[in-house]
Amino acid sequence: MGQKIHPHGLRLGITSDWKSHWYADKNYAEYLAEDIRVREYLVKTLDRAGIADVVIERTRERVRVDIHTARPGIVIGRRGSEADRLRTSLEKLTGKQVALNILEVKNIDANAQLVAQSIAEQLTNRVAFRRAMRKAIQGAMRQPQVKGIKVVCSGRLGGAEMSRTERYHEGRVPLHTLRAEIDYGTYEAHTTFGRIGVKVWIYKGDVVGGRRESEINAPAERRGRGDRNGRPRRGGQRRQRSEQKQEG
């Protein structure tokens, strides 16, 4: 069912792509376990860098790791020192040459993983869970490519004795529709009362004919002051003429 299954796994090859790009026969289990270790190491080491996604691509000689982050400065470090340290650690972990690509996520409020992480960080800092959830929903719905969002928090919310689940949503989130582009992210908040799980679904439109609505609805570059066609407004010309008459 659409509500139970992972949205990314359900839409693999339809609207979403694999996060590991390689082929293996007898070494499949070894590569898979290695990918898991690489991702766990990066998430643990760069917990404050806002890691949105990690894509791994393998060839015979080397491993390429693409890190999608909201704060690339933390990952790179001063004069690339942190990136060099990460590369050395990953080469020891994989036993191959590692090419590290650090990519910035510009639209943070439209990324489900970063939204979930933001809510979890607020819960850790003792912000009221309803306030954190509503703030995340309002920030996401301001983005032009976001058509709907659903947020779920589970655990001892507000320090209650009994754990419960709270859900908030706005707009459309069609989890059964395969052509729907659903971004999904999870994160855990470590509080004094225990762990609180955060899940976020963001609907960004449909994918029709290989074209994504989110790319079509992406915010365009801001024009200068003028009319819709980019021409200067007439008021400015009138002001210039009146000033010229006064000077004459």
From Swiss-Prot:
Stretches for region Disordered: 213-248
Occurrences of domain KH type-2 (ranges): 38-106
GO molecular function: mRNA binding; rRNA binding; structural constituent of ribosome
Compositional bias segments (type: Basic and acidic residues): 213-230
Family classification: Belongs to the universal ribosomal protein uS3 family.
Function of the protein: Binds the lower part of the 30S subunit head. Binds mRNA in the 70S ribosome, positioning it for translation.
Protein name in the entry: Small ribosomal subunit protein uS3
